[in-house]
Amino acid sequence: MPLFRDLTILQQKLNGFPVVTYQVGESVLTAGLRTGRLLILKEGAVEVLKEGVQVAAVTEPGAVFGELSVLLDQPHTADVRALEVSQFHVADGATLLRIDPIGLLYVATILARRLASANQSLIELKRQVQTGEPRDTIDDTVEKMELLVGATYPVTAH
């Protein structure tokens, strides 16, 4: 399977990137700032916050942060804060995505999966509204969508 092989190659490349450690409560990314960096979770746990509200907690190694800022050339749209001591592989985002097709494929696959899941949740939400589902059921679907939009999950070989 090509993606599995590419993930193995990507993991080997990640081992060549610097690793940065963040302590509990330390800010990893700050909304409104530009860092130009892609951060790939090596180990630990972080929370993603939008306007001070936690929209996701991420513990999965391989999760990517900062990709939207790099791809759209805009400031970060969320705060990311360490929930426990966390380590990240750090890469210059623009350089990595421009010269490394495997890195680009990895980020594109993550974004495509997130978009597909968000689209499915939107369909579910529309059905719930049309059929008059209870408000708490609709709220659960909205929360699910917020999680999908708030975090970038790693690609795994299936």
Protein language model features and the residues they cover:
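Cytosolic regulatory regions built on CNB/CRP/Popeye-like sensor folds
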Residues: 1-158
